């Protein structure tokens, strides 16, 4: 029978000093012997996805205390990728993921916490906490802040839905007048919450449902809706139940590694492919799997991508639907239900509610249940009122969207495409693979051959795109932006956005060893591995080289002979694998990250051979 970890600091005469300090935090005599549960919050006023989380920890803590636990809250950092985008701040985004994982480990292990509730929301915070949960393997429940409502404004007397990417793209489009840009900027992000499309933050919060570590509705229920409050209350109660099952009943099935098995990781990846989620999720799932000691690799992702169809298209892959529409269509339980009926889901994986994922689908899939409470839950919709307050409205759609032929979520029979929303490509330029979000690629360019135009940094690429150097038919190469080469593996949202803004979104491809924002669409191929700084072939490309991309056949080839590549490699070995003429100030913290980082095909985690 496992004993409470917290007993290390609360039991025995020799812990009188520690108990004295615990008492100074507010603990009473009868609290010693109860499970101490870390409430891992990430409130910050820097990030709209986290600006409303200040009071969420208190909600969770009250339920923990009422159920017989002791709640102790602490905060992690949180970087806003959108605000950090397009300048040196983006170098810090991915490294913050690992820093968050470490900080959670430090706090939980230093204070011998017995379990944790992870209150996350945005791009690197959920993955960082997920890595920590897998590493620590103590009872854990995830509950996120929820998605932002989609922006809405009138342009040319037509009501349109908006998000962050629209503001970025229109500002770079010289045909859009200043008044329209101003209207879009002021309407694109109307409420608290993670940005309203299927970008990285929302993708990751959806994947925690598929992994079994969060509650139904976690990924799709709006941050502003009153119904979301119940997710926090339930998380507080449920974590105490998980503690009892583990520490009092010796039931290890409630631990994160028992829930997030390889089958669960496959479920999460299948969901990601089916909903056309962010390519960043590949990076984060690979990293979390390594922390969980689960053998889940790019080969598994490739296998799944060849059989899972695209069942949902949401911004940025379409302007028609945002996360509020996914929720109306039944949320993640509905997509998982369609995967289950297509025999593309492991239905026997477990969840933090103590059910199998199959049992959870039966209870919460709106096409299977007549339960009015469930249907009411998924009718929760936007209010259209600017606010930074959680639970500030209780508006509802008149009906759910259960149209699986033409609605937001489709059945396999009526899928947006039988080919999934994400694909892994391999070839001589990406021996260990690269990733493309196929849900955002126009059918006309699923096969594309063009001339390379090479840039040694994101900044140089942006200058080249806006300066007219990039033309139709080019394959834009942005290299030395990988985990090592950046260092930090920047997102390339500005280059892809600017290509669209000048009318080249369907006329060019982009290949990088960096990564993309979840807001990216188009023929944008990232995570090229090995990266240039690790001697990857992308570092050998020269202007004018032909590159052939074939998404249906999962191939990407640099059309240069092996003999020529061998000559170039010998020359580059002599010069060193570093960018030519790039001026970039790199801090000691970033140098440390780059020194230990692996390439993207390994999740950009630390290279343990260097420890």
From Swiss-Prot:
GO annotation (BP), single: isoleucine biosynthetic process
GO molecular-function terms, A-Z: 2 iron, 2 sulfur cluster binding; dihydroxy-acid dehydratase activity; magnesium ion binding
Residues at the active site: 517
Pfam families associated with the record: ILV_EDD_C, ILVD_EDD_N
Annotated binding of Mg(2+), by residue: 81, 123-124, 491
One GO CC annotation: cytosol
Modified sites of kind N6-carboxylysine: 124
Required co-factors: [2Fe-2S] cluster; Mg(2+)
InterPro entries attached to this UniProt entry: Dihydro-acid_dehy_C, DihydroxyA_deHydtase, DiOHA_6PGluconate_deHydtase_CS, ILV_EDD_C, ILV_EDD_N, IlvD/EDD_N
PROSITE patterns: ILVD_EDD_1, ILVD_EDD_2
Residues the record lists as binding [2Fe-2S] cluster: 122, 195
Keyword Amino-acid biosynthesis tagged: yes
Claim: Lipid biosynthesis is one of the keywords in the record: no
EC number of this enzyme: 4.2.1.9
Keyword list, A-Z: 2Fe-2S, Amino-acid biosynthesis, Branched-chain amino acid biosynthesis, Iron, Iron-sulfur, Lyase, Magnesium, Metal-binding
Reactions that this protein is recorded to catalyse: (2R)-2,3-dihydroxy-3-methylbutanoate = 3-methyl-2-oxobutanoate + H2O; (2R,3R)-2,3-dihydroxy-3-methylpentanoate = (S)-3-methyl-2-oxopentanoate + H2O
Pathway entry: Amino-acid biosynthesis; L-isoleucine biosynthesis; L-isoleucine from 2-oxobutanoate: step 3/4; Amino-acid biosynthesis; L-valine biosynthesis; L-valine from pyruvate: step 3/4
Signal peptide: none
Cofactor note: Binds 1 [2Fe-2S] cluster per subunit. This cluster acts as a Lewis acid cofactor.
Function: Functions in the biosynthesis of branched-chain amino acids. Catalyzes the dehydration of (2R,3R)-2,3-dihydroxy-3-methylpentanoate (2,3-dihydroxy-3-methylvalerate) into 2-oxo-3-methylpentanoate (2-oxo-3-methylvalerate) and of (2R)-2,3-dihydroxy-3-methylbutanoate (2,3-dihydroxyisovalerate) into 2-oxo-3-methylbutanoate (2-oxoisovalerate), the penultimate precursor to L-isoleucine and L-valine, respectively.
NCBIfam families: ilvD (TIGR00110), PRK12448.1 (NF009103)
Assembly and oligomerization: Homodimer.
PANTHER family referenced in this protein's UniProt entry, alphabetically: D-XYLONATE DEHYDRATASE (PTHR43661), D-XYLONATE DEHYDRATASE YAGF-RELATED (PTHR43661:SF3)
Family that this chain belongs to: Belongs to the IlvD/Edd family.
This protein's name: Dihydroxy-acid dehydratase
Organism encoding this protein: Actinobacillus pleuropneumoniae serotype 5b (strain L20)
């Amino acid at each position: 029978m496992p004993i409470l970890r917290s007993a290390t600091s609360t039991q025995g005469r020799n812990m009188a000093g520690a108990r004295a300090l615990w008492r100074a935090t507010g603990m009473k005599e009868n609290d010693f012997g109860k499970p101490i549960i870390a409430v891992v919050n990430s409130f910050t006023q820097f990030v709209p996805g986290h600006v409303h989380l200040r009071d969420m920890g208190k909600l969770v803590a009250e339920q923990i205390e009422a159920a017989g636990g002791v709640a102790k809250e602490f905060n992690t950092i949180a970087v806003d990728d959108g605000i950090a985008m397009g300048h040196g701040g983006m170098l810090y985004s991915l490294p913050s993921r690992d820093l968050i994982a470490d900080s959670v480990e430090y706090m939980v292990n230093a204070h011998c916490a017995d379990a944790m509730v992870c209150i996350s929301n945005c791009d690197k915070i959920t993955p960082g906490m997920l890595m920590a949960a897998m590493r620590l393997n103590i009872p854990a429940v995830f509950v996120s802040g929820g998605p932002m409502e989609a922006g809405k404004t009138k342009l040319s007397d037509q009501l349109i839905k908006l998000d962050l990417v629209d503001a970025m793209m229109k500002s770079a489009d010289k045909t859009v007048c200043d008044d329209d840009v101003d209207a879009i900027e002021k309407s694109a992000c109307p409420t608290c919450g993670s940005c309203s499309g299927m970008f990285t933050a929302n993708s990751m919060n959806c994947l925690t449902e598929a992994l079994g570590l969060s509650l139904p509705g976690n990924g799709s229920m709006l941050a502003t809706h009153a119904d979301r409050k119940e997710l926090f209350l339930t998380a507080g109660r449920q974590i105490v139940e998980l503690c009892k099952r583990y520490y009092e009943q010796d039931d290890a099935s409630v631990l994160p590694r028992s829930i997030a098995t390889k089958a669960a990781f496959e479920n999460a990846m299948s969901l990601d492919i089916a909903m056309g989620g962010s390519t960043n999720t590949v990076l984060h799932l690979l990293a979390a799997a390594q922390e969980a000691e689960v053998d889940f690799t790019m080969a598994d992702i490739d296998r799944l991508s060849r059989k899972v169809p695209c069942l949902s298209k949401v911004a940025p892959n379409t302007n028609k639907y945002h996360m509020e529409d996914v929720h109306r269509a039944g949320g993640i339980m509905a997509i998982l239900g369609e995967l289950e009926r297509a025999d593309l889901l492991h239905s026997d994986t477990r969840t933090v509610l103590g059910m199998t994922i199959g049992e959870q689908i039966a209870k919460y899939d709106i096409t299977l249940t007549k339960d009015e409470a469930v249907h009411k839950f998924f009718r929760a919709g936007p209010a259209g009122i600017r606010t930074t307050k959680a639970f500030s409205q209780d508006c509802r759609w008149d009906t759910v969207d259960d149209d699986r032929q033409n609605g937001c979520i489709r059945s396999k029979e009526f899928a947006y495409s039988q080919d999934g929303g994400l694909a892994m490509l391999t070839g001589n330029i990406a021996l260990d693979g690269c990733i493309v979000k196929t849900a955002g690629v126009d059918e006309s360019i699923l096969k594309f051959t063009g001339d390379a135009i090479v840039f040694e940094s994101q900044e140089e690429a942006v200058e080249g795109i806006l300066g007219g150097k990039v033309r139709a038919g080019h394959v834009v190469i942005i290299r030395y932006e990988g985990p090592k080469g950046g260092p930090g593996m920047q997102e390339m949202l500005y280059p892809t956005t600017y290509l669209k803004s000048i009318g080249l979104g369907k006329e060019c491809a982009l290949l990088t060893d960096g990564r993309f924002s979840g807001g990216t669409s188009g023929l944008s191929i990232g995570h090229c591995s090995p990266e240039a700084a690790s001697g990857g072939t992308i570092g050998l490309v020269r202007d004018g080289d032909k590159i052939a991309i074939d998404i249906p056949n999962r191939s990407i080839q640099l059309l240069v002979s092996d003999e020529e590549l061998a000559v170039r490699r010998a020359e580059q070995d002599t010069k060193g694998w570093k960018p030519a003429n790039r001026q970039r100030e790199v801090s000691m913290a970033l140098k440390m990250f780059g020194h230990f980082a692996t390439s993207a095909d390994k999740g950009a985690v630390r290279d343990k051979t260097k420890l």
